Regions:
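C-terminal helix-coil-helix/basic helical segment that borders enzyme active sites and/or dimer interfaces
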Residues: 56-63, 304, 313, 327-383
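A cross-taxon signal for low-complexity, glycine/charged-rich
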Residues: 3-20
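Amphipathic, small/basic residue-rich leader segments at the start of a protein or domain
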Residues: 21-127, 148-155, 284-285, 300-301, ...
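Glycine-rich beta->alpha junctions and the first turn(s) of the following alpha-helix
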Residues: 30-34, 39, 233-331, 339, ...
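Alpha-helix capping/hinge segments and adjacent helical runs
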Residues: 49, 53, 86, 90, ...
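Internal helix-loop-helix
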Residues: 78-157, 197-204, 326, 340-348, ...
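A short, Trp-centered hydrophobic/proline-enriched beta-strand micro-motif
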Residues: 156-164
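A short core secondary-structure module
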Residues: 177, 185-186, 190-236
Length: 441
């Protein structure tokens, strides 16, 4: 968001950032520092000069960042934008310069997201690589890994995916069954992953496997990265209810991964995965969608039998409630940003934010369709008023309550880390993985 009195270009979506944390963690200043104001001006100038403005109108109507450009493939357009950002020094801002980034502060990163606006949706194919896989490679890879792979990820030359969830191990990541067996200097991988976003267009993947079934489930895991074009890797896109194919099943049959593509020690995969999962929640939280801006605009323009929707008392009451939640989410995220700006680790802010935003998104989509009446049943019939964005939002919103941690997992985090309640009873604690009862055994 721009400072008071300044005019923002139409693609700016953000609110003014709470910039600088003063004295205490929860004392926050709304204004840009001189350095941040200069950074914002530089970013705005570059975006105005380089953004692919032919896509602005379509991007502004894309619900949840689910982009489906009419005439061009999103991956190709995204790669072109990512490459241009890398050439201009605006890709993966928070990464070190030697790995393709800019060494920017957390607040500068948020300022950039505000100034990039709707064009940030074009980089959707790179969000997992930048926000989750890249930081994991940075933390556990050797220097050769970092200098070879990270600049290519930052420039858009490579796309990465995250291979964690399995048919019998979604929220319980440590319950995974994909096996990795050591043979000489290589590892042989067999198993299956599911709900892998972007696997069908990814070049590399971050893969967590089970290397020792004779120890408790969290202790027998090992992390690797692999070429998604490796022999024995089969990717099957999953057709979704909204007509898109963002997720995939991935099968591994005697896939060979050299030991030098291991991240972390053998058996330490759980600790490595915590780095990935922590960055996943932060990545999701950075661009948390609520549907409120779209809903407010929709109600302000939708004419019903009784007049404008926004003039209806019941609708105004709902909008007021959502506005309060949206404001709370904004300031909760600012708290996390303030902590990061001081070098602190954020608390449970992203869990709280995702939990509230996910349910809010679903509620808004359902109410919008109620307002549309009969037109809400068919995407095409509503195109004139809302371009079908709320129908797409309703079909996609359940996934937002699952990806990056289900509502139940997030409530457990809040209960245990914020309220200090005792953790769930775990009957499999300290039990070797191969001794845990399963169906058919």
């Amino acid at each position: 968001m721009v400072r008071d009195g300044a005019k923002a270009p139409p693609h700016h979506e953000g609110e003014k950032l709470i910039e600088d944390c003063k004295v205490e963690r929860f004392t926050m200043n709304f204004d840009d520092t001189p350095q941040e104001a200069a950074f914002r001006a530089e970013a705005r100038k570059w975006v105005d000069a380089n953004a692919p403005k032919q896509y602005e109108a379509e991007l502004s109507k894309a619900s949840l960042g689910r982009i489906k450009l009419e005439n061009e493939e999103i991956v190709d357009v995204g790669k072109a934008w990512q490459k241009k950002k890398a050439e201009g020094g605006w890709a993966c801002l928070h990464w070190p310069k030697e790995y393709g980034g800019r060494g920017a502060t957390p607040i500068e990163r948020v300022i950039w997201q505000q100034e990039e606006g709707v064009y940030g949706k074009l980089t959707q194919p790179f969000q997992i690589g930048e926000g989750m896989c890249g930081p994991t490679v940075m933390a556990y890879g050797n220097e050769e890994h970092k200098r070879h792979y990270l600049p290519k990820l930052a420039s858009g030359e490579q796309i990465w995916c995250q291979l964690f969830s399995e048919p019998a191990g979604g929220s319980d990541v440590a319950g995974l069954r994909t096996r990795a067996e050591k043979r000489g200097e290589d590892w042989i991988i067999n198993g299956q992953k599911i709900w892998t976003s972007g696997a069908h267009y990814s070049d590399y993947g971050l893969l967590i496997t089970r290397t020792d079934p004779n120890v408790p489930k969290h202790k027998g895991l090992t992390m690797f990265f692999l070429d998604m074009k490796s022999r024995g890797v089969e990717v099957r896109p999953i057709k979704q209810a909204n007509g898109m194919q963002e997720f995939n099943e991935v099968y591994f049959t005697d896939v060979v991964i050299p030991d030098h593509q291991r991240l972390g020690a053998v058996g330490d995969g759980w600790n490595v995965s915590l780095t990935t999962l922590m960055n996943e929640r932060m990545s999701i939280g950075a661009r948390l969608a609520t549907g409120f801006p779209e809903m407010f605009e929709f109600c302000a323009n939708l004419m019903t039998d009784d007049g404008l929707a926004i003039d209806d008392r019941a609708t105004r009451s709902k909008l007021a409630s959502w506005a309060v939640k949206a404001s709370g989410l904004k300031y909760t995220s600012y708290r996390a940003i303030s902590a990061l700006s001081k070098g602190e680790r954020p608390g449970p802010e992203n869990s709280i934010g995702k939990l509230v935003a996910g349910s809010m998104l679903q509620d808004i989509a359902m109410y919008a369709m109620d307002l549309e009446g009969a037109a809400g049943v068919f995407t095409g019939a509503a195109e004139e008023e809302a371009r079908g964005q709320f129908q797409q939002m309703l079909l996609s919103s359940p996934s937002m309550r699952i990806a990056g941690g289900t509502d139940e997992i997030l409530r457990n985090i809040i209960a245990e880390r914020v309220l200090g309640l005792p953790g769930d009873i775990r009957v499999d604690k300290d039990v070797p993985f191969n001794k845990i009862p399963t169906k058919g055994r």
